[in-house]
Amino acid sequence: MKKVIMALGVLAFANALMATDVKALAKSCAACHGVKFEKKALGKSKIVNMMSEAEIEKDLMDFKSGANKNPIMSAQAKKLSDEDIKALAKYIPTLK
């Protein structure tokens, strides 16, 4: 029984370490998009906090894959894991 409890504790700790730090990711976007994603980046982009979770996730995945042609955003999105993208897409709409 002690081994099972120990194993569950180790798994829970490992999972917590691997969790996406979405606030840290969002800070790296703030220079262009604003702290609450309320700005048009470089005066051109959509206002991201006005988008739905699904729209944000799709756009970031498309930037990552190259389907959306924007060299700056493609370079940024390629640094993100799919988990990071999902976490950002869920987090950003809460900043309104």
Curated annotation (Swiss-Prot):
Signal peptide (UniProt feature, chain positions):
1-19
According to its UniProt record, how is this protein modified after translation? Binds 1 heme c group covalently per subunit.
Positions that bind heme c: 29, 32-33, 73
Q: What's a single GO MF annotation on this record?
A: iron ion binding
Q: Where does it reside?
A: Periplasm
Q: Would you tell me the Gene Ontology cellular component terms? A: periplasmic space
Function in brief: Natural electron acceptor for a formate dehydrogenase.
Q: What is this protein called?
A: Cytochrome c-553
Q: What organism is listed for this UniProt entry?
A: Helicobacter pylori (strain ATCC 700392 / 26695) (Campylobacter pylori)
